[in-house]
From Swiss-Prot:
Active site, per annotation: 233 (proton donor)
UniProt pathway: Amino-acid biosynthesis; L-methionine biosynthesis via salvage pathway; L-methionine from S-methyl-5-thio-alpha-D-ribose 1-phosphate: step 1/6
Record NCBIfam families: eIF-2B_rel (TIGR00524), PRK05720.1 (NF004326), salvage_mtnA (TIGR00512)
Record function comment: Catalyzes the interconversion of methylthioribose-1-phosphate (MTR-1-P) into methylthioribulose-1-phosphate (MTRu-1-P).
Catalysis performed (reactions): 5-(methylsulfanyl)-alpha-D-ribose 1-phosphate = 5-(methylsulfanyl)-D-ribulose 1-phosphate
EC category: isomerase
Family, as annotated: Belongs to the eIF-2B alpha/beta/delta subunits family. MtnA subfamily.
Cross-referenced InterPro entries: IF-2B-related, IF-M1Pi, IF_2B-like_C, Initiation_fac_2B_a/b/d, M1Pi_N, NagB/RpiA_transferase-like
Name of a matching Pfam family: IF-2B
Biological process terms in GO annotation: L-methionine salvage from methylthioadenosine
Organism annotation: Alcanivorax borkumensis (strain ATCC 700651 / DSM 11573 / NCIMB 13689 / SK2)
Keywords associated with the record: Amino-acid biosynthesis, Isomerase, Methionine biosynthesis
Name by which UniProt lists this protein: Methylthioribose-1-phosphate isomerase
């Protein structure tokens, strides 16, 4: 069965990913035919955003099982599982998707296993879109009429199964006519804000103004921002949140200026196994991502570089976490546990 979204197309016998490294100047779709290609696409930023990474990994494992045919079993798939799990260590949705597939597949083998994995990967894809649409409505309820919001990185349809997390809230608020506009930080070093978020919002007709990351404090000081809305790659049991590098800076600035700081993420991004943010593994990426921009060197060749892909925002700085199940106000361990318990009951 074909399942399509803005950046991910499942065609039954292969996967197509929109190469987000080429946007906004070029639209290029890449064919993904096995787990190694899926892992490479995740690692090399062809696809990014925690939900989209989880969806891609699920399809990648299903493809590997198809290739194995009658030899497919959870034991023979372990190398593929390890390869996919190693592709981006911070995004918990990746591990969640692989663990879910294992539970769903059970003791199946051969073609029955391959079919089951494909079915559940499709379900993960569809469920993410529905979750984002619900999240958008819950999050829009938190915004005042006429708000202008600030967002960081890209959390839209390109980063998910559709609609988006933080950008989904923005889309839903715009549909309600309660949003005035959006400031999008450029998000160095990969420029997801300038290349992807501005592209998505402009295509939707939502007023967006692109700014340098270092402009956020001035905008808040001038009273031009009524809320900051970001996504998440992992949220620990106490509400500490890993997200794109620069998110922590925004949370500190928002608290200083008494501006709501809202995190949007599906329940699959919550990781109750980790008590707090100090336990999150932070991915460090290649130094040349900072030294160079689109292949052009902007720094001395041998200058040392520190390039973490994510930072940790303490729960104390977060006004609310929005999931598809509702809103966790001023998150802490007890509130996160209660939210997860309600999710299990429903």
């Amino acid at each position: 069965m074909a399942v399509n979204s803005a950046a991910i197309r499942w065609l039954g016998d292969h996967l197509q990913l929109l190469d987000q490294r080429c946007l906004p100047t070029e639209t290029l779709w890449l064919d993904i035919c096995d787990s190694q290609q899926a892992a490479d696409a995740i690692r090399n930023m062809v696809v990014r955003g925690a939900p989209a990474i989880g969806i891609t990994a699920a399809y990648g494992l299903a493809l590997e099982a198809q290739i194995m045919g009658n030899d497919a079993s959870w034991v023979t798939l372990q190398n593929a599982v390890a390869t996919l799990a190693d592709s981006r260590p911070t995004a918990v949705n990746l591990f969640w998707a692989l663990e879910r597939l294992q539970r769903y597949a059970g003791d199946l083998q051969g073609k029955a296993l391959a079919q089951a994995l494909a079915e559940d990967a499709e379900a993960i894809h569809r469920e993410d879109l529905a979750a984002n649409q619900a999240m958008g409505e819950f999050g829009a309820d938190l915004l005042p009429s006429g708000a202008t919001v600030y967002t960081h990185c890209n959390t839209g349809a390109l980063a998910t199964g559709g609609h988006g997390t933080a950008l989904g809230i923005i889309r839903s608020a715009w549909a309600r006519n309660q949003l005035t506009g959006v400031f999008a930080g450029e998000t160095r070093p990969w420029l997801q804000g300038s290349r992807l978020t501005s592209w998505e919002l402009l295509n939707d007709g939502i007023p967006v103004t692109l700014v340098a990351d270092s402009c956020a404090g001035q905008l808040m000081q001038q009273g031009k921002i009524q809320a900051v809305i970001v996504g998440a790659d992992r949220i620990t049991a106490n509400g500490d949140t890993a997200n794109k590098i620069g998110t922590y800076n925004l949370a500190v600035l928002a608290q200083h200026h008494n501006i709501p700081f809202i995190v949007a993420a599906p329940v699959s991004t919550l990781d109750p196994a980790l008590p707090n943010g100090s336990h999150i593994v932070i991915e460090e990426r290649d130094a040349n991502e900072v030294r160079n921009v689109q292949g052009k060197s902007l720094a001395p060749e041998h200058c040392p570089v520190y390039n973490p892909a994510f930072d940790i925002t303490p729960a104390q700085l977060i006004t609310a976490i929005v999931t598809e199940r509702g809103v966790v106000h001023r998150p802490d361990t007890a509130k996160i546990n209660s939210h997860l318990a309600q999710t299990k009951e429903s």
